Each structure stands twice: as structure tokens, then as C-alpha cells.
A protein has these predicted regions:
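Positively charged
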Residues: 1-136
Length: 136
């Protein structure tokens, strides 16, 4: 189901809680909401649709990948950039890593480990920041 985007900075600034198998529908809602906003958005965290759970979705080109309880396990090659966010106005400076490795659970609750680089790594880092209440 397509959800409304949360723009409440106080809400977004609060950390999320671990996701469980009971939260699968939230992942589906993220898929629907990202699809509805695809012209202006490439990733989303569950708190952006009003749910404080550790769930994100990242556009990886031709597919959108939902990650439950994602954790960055390695990172390298730091750089500075500017980013925008559906929940905020304008763009802001931030620091990211060119390459990351992330562990997460998929829809089947199978643990995955994936190496990401460039734009996809940047999107993933932005969304994982949302989970800890960090806003660009």
C-alpha cells in the first residue's frame, strides 16, 4: 500500500527498532511507496512512511531491494557529497563511502551479504542513516 511520506524531523530523528518476520508487510509498503515516488526518489527507510523499524529499500538500477535489519560491515574510500531527501527540503552536504558491504535479511528472512559501490552504496548509506535517526 502506498503510504504518505513523513516530514516530521522529530519523528525522523528517533532511532528505529529491529524488524521481525512479522514486519514483512512494511517491506511491501516500501516497495509500493517507492514505486509511486520513482520520479523523485531512489531509496526509502521505514520511518519515512511512519514506521520505526529497521527496514529500507534501495533502487539498484532495474530492481528495488528491500533490506530488513541492514548493517554496514565494511566501508572504504570516504568522500564528500550533497544529498536530498523526500522528507526534507533542498540538499545538504554529507560524507559517504565509495564502497560498502552490507548484511541484511531478505523477504524470506534469509541472511544476505552484498558489496555495493558508487551511487548504490551512497543510497544504501543514506537509508541506513535514517534507521539510527541521522538526518543529512
Amino acid at each position: 500500500m502506498v503510504k504518505q511520506i513523513v516530514r516530521d524531523i522529530f519523528f525522523l530523528g528517533q532511532p528505529s527498532k529491529p524488524a521481525t518476520k512479522a514486519d514483512i508487510q512494511i517491506g511491501k509498503d516500501l516497495q509500493d511507496t517507492l514505486q509511486a515516488n520513482r520520479e523523485r526518489c531512489v531509496g526509502m527507510a521505514a520511518n519515512m512512511i511512519g514506521v520505526k523499524k529497521n527496514i529500507i529499500i534501495v533502487n539498484m538500477g532495474f530492481i528495488n531491494v528491500v533490506m530488513f535489519n541492514p548493517v554496514i560491515v565494511s566501508k572504504r574510500d570516504m568522500y564528500e557529497t550533497e544529498e536530498g531527501c523526500l522528507s526534507l527540503d533542498g540538499v545538504r552536504k554529507t560524507t559517504r563511502y565509495q564502497e560498502i558491504e552490507v548484511e541484511y535479511y531478505d523477504f524470506n528472512w534469509k541472511k544476505q551479504r552484498q558489496k555495493l559501490s558508487g551511487w548504490t552504496a551512497q543510497i544504501c548509506q543514506h537509508e541506513i542513516d535514517h534507521l539510527s535517526g541521522k538526518i543529512i
